[in-house]
Amino acid sequence: MSAPLRIRENGIDLFVRLTPKSSLDRLEGVETSADGRSHLKARVRAVPENGAANQALERLVAKTLGVPASSVSVVAGGTSRLKTVRIVGDPEALAQRVEALG
């Protein structure tokens, strides 16, 4: 299974499948879709209105990976379940933290 991320010069892009309106906020590991792409499964309590679920996802990823919330942002898939989250920081260290979640 491939890692659910892409290494960038100044960080990583993390591919996430988000489920809003969950009973709790959590990252649930790596999943592979039918087309063979990997993504990290995430659940948040926030509702998908006015970007609340995206903001909750950004906070959850920042807390889980131990990075400042300001270095995490949803850059693609704002209204979709499948999102790309950009995390600024040391790419190798971030990749290791994500792989440990798998």
Curated annotation (Swiss-Prot):
Domain of life per record: Bacteria
InterPro entries: DUF167, YggU-like_sf
SMART domains: DUF167
Cysteine-cysteine disulfides: none
Pfam families assigned to the protein according to its UniProt record, in alphabetical order: DUF167
Family of the protein in this entry: Belongs to the UPF0235 family.
Protein's name according to its UniProt entry: UPF0235 protein msl4154
Organism: Mesorhizobium japonicum (strain LMG 29417 / CECT 9101 / MAFF 303099) (Mesorhizobium loti (strain MAFF 303099))
